[in-house]
């Protein structure tokens, strides 16, 4: 068995990355044994052959992640090599620190690993720079089975102009978690469809029930990701910033509208005061008001709902639907992924690399080894395998099930770059604090965004 160790990777940096990084690790993806495509038949036939029938092939596989992810991945590599003894996979792994810079240098110099893990926020910039960095999974349908993924998940994760340059390692997304006991007592229903305006009315009912309670809690980050961005997408039908044109997808009046909505949430006591929440940063579950059930619901992510639930053991929590305005032009909510897996466009062994990734995603033994080290599995067979093991249940799975029902456009690219995120988050936070009118904040925000876009 391969031992857990770091493989040193020495490269000369050809350039530095200007792409927005996101090295968020989650859990995993797994797969099941019920494969139906030609890819399955091809691999099964290949597996019956001996090493003597093939020239030896060595693949490099680069990823980041903690010890649990690393050991599980190494164990899958071992299993694959036992079934395909003519293929050797050299593992190159470590932490996320410096990973993007190393990846950039290797892509530019043509020395990148045959198989590599990719940050979702980085990929649009890489594809724009040179789509040839990546092999298209659609070109290998006889080796890699894409049918086990939901089409909408593939469309929003790793697909560019119809080319599947990456496949998601898991399913994640925005979530709303709520205290079902409190909601039932007050007469609030998050299990049915509702609008942004309905949230305000729900908040008023909470105040009538208990003036010290709030319907919602959220941090400054969620103000942007859970209100500003989806609201604008629903209102305009466009992504916030348009990658193709390098223009805004909204007008100043649209931003004024969403900022006025945020102002209403805080003026009416629908959302807990930002001055109270800000002290807890991203750890909303440590807020005593959450622990003491003074908040009915919280905006968050599928990867954090279990933490929020665990912080209040006396509560009875459920995953709720997400708000969509009447006559929305885009639902604004969508599944995304923690990371992508990619095959190098420069690899001399793309078929074998695809064979390994098909095993990684679509093999029952691999699924049982990987469990959930890269988030909720993105494939139907992977989810079934995890369900059989009893490790895919509860509020995280419920929140993922809900986010999968939405078909909004993934606003990945310019909108999610670090500078833009900071601009939008700051605008929403200013209004939440009452530090500027929606009109004034919108005007200054437009100026900052246009200045940013002019540099692109």
Where are these regions (language model features)?
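Extracytoplasmic/periplasmic substrate-recognition and gating elements
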Residues: 78, 82, 88, 186, ...
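Mature extracytoplasmic/periplasmic domains
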Residues: 132-134, 138, 303-307, 339-418, ...
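Extracytoplasmic/periplasmic solute-binding protein
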Residues: 161, 165-169, 174, 200-254, ...
């Amino acid at each position: 068995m391969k031992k857990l160790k770091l493989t040193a990777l020495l490269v000369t940096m050809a350039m530095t990355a200007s792409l927005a990084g996101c090295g968020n690790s989650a859990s995993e993806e797994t797969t099941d044994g019920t494969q139906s495509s030609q890819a399955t038949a091809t691999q099964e036939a290949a597996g019956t052959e001996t090493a003597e029938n093939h020239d030896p092939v060595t693949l490099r596989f680069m990823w980041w992640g903690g010890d649990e992810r690393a050991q599980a991945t190494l164990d899958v590599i071992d299993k694959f090599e036992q079934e395909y003894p003519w293929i050797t996979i050299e593992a190159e792994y470590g932490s996320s620190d410096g990973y993007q810079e190393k990846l950039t240098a290797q892509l530019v110099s043509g020395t990148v690993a045959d198989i590599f893990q990719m940050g979702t926020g980085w990929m649009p910039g890489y594809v724009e720079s040179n789509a040839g960095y990546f092999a298209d999974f659609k070109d290998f349908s006889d080796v890699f089975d894409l049918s086990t993924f939901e089409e909408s998940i593939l469309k929003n994760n790793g697909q560019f102009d119809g080319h599947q340059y990456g496949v998601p390692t898991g399913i994640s997304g925005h979530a709303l978690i709520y205290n079902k006991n409190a909601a039932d007592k007050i007469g609030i229903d998050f299990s049915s469809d509702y609008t942004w305006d309905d949230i305000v009315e729900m908040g008023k009912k909470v105040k009538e029930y208990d003036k010290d309670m709030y319907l919602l809690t959220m941090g400054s980050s969620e103000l942007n990701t859970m209100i500003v961005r989806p609201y604008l997408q629903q209102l305009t039908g466009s992504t916030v910033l348009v990658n193709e044109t390098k223009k805004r997808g909204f007008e100043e009046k649209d931003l004024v509208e969403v900022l006025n909505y945020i102002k209403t949430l805080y003026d009416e006591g629908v959302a807990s005061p930002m001055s109270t929440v800000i002290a807890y940063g991203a750890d909303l579950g440590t807020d005593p008001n959450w622990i003491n059930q003074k908040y009915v619901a919280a905006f968050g992510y599928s990867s954090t709902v279990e933490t929020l639930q665990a912080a209040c053991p006396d509560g009875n929590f459920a995953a709720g639907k997400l708000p969509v305005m009447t006559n929305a032009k885009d639902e604004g909510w969508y599944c995304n992924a923690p990371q992508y897996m990619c095959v190098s466009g420069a690899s001399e062994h793309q078929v074998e690399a695809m064979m390994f990734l098909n095993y990684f995603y679509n093999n029952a033994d691999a699924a049982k080894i990987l469990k959930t080290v890269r988030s909720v599995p993105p494939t139907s067979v992977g989810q079934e395998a995890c369900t059989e093991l009893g490790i895919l249940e509860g509020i995280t799975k419920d929140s993922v099930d809900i986010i999968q029902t939405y078909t909004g456009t993934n606003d990945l690219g310019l909108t999610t770059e670090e500078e833009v995120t900071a601009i939008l988050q700051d605008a929403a936070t200013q209004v939440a604090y009452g530090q500027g009118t929606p009109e004034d904040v919108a005007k200054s925000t437009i100026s900052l965004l246009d200045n940013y876009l002019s540099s692109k």
